[in-house]
């Protein structure tokens, strides 16, 4: 995120990629894709037997959505306040899309999942989003916090429900990924069509478009934009 044409890095921080992969697609894997995909595959260890809910549909959340679909989760449910993002999630293959602002949101969610999601992944970096993820997780299920909030954001959870319902709450930093191990794996999934992250690329921009791009990102009007010097 330094917006530099070149960077000096130790070799341990580099991952060799197939020369056939366009740079504008490879660039997506440096943060958002590994965080979202890793949260589902590494942190939550989701399987085809799980129902997976993604709360927050930015670049990280939509990457998590693609991961859930790629592993064949029983159900993939997308949750966001933006109807445009929900429409994109549906296009990408989500089984259900829900807006928390809708009337009877929780009741509807619990109905379509028969009591809650096995796994709920929060990717918005919002205390409200994490609370929503916890509330829609079923008894014995796992809630993953993958979003990065401000240092003073706090939430209140029921101690009783954590204990009595045998809940699991896990943090996920960069998708619990080891770059040299996981990025080649995810790139292979991309090349074989299992992880179509290129569909998350909203536009390619030049340096002179940078401020407008940052505004779009701040207003949640874009998913991923790649700077081409």
Locate predicted features.
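NAD(P)H dinucleotide-binding glycine-rich loop of Rossmann-like/cofactor-binding domains
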Residues: 1-55, 195
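Local beta-strand N-terminus motif with an aromatic residue
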Residues: 49, 94, 116-117, 197, ...
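Adenosine-nucleotide cofactor-binding segment
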Residues: 54-57, 69-132
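N-terminal Rossmann-fold NAD(P) dinucleotide-binding loop
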Residues: 61-62
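Residues in the short beta-alpha loop(s) of Rossmann-like NAD(P)-binding domains
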Residues: 82, 149, 175
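C-terminal hydrophobic helical "lid"/dimerization subdomain
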Residues: 131-135, 180-229
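ADP-ribose/adenylate-binding Rossmann-like module
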Residues: 137-152
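Rossmann-fold dehydrogenase core element
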Residues: 142-144, 157-199
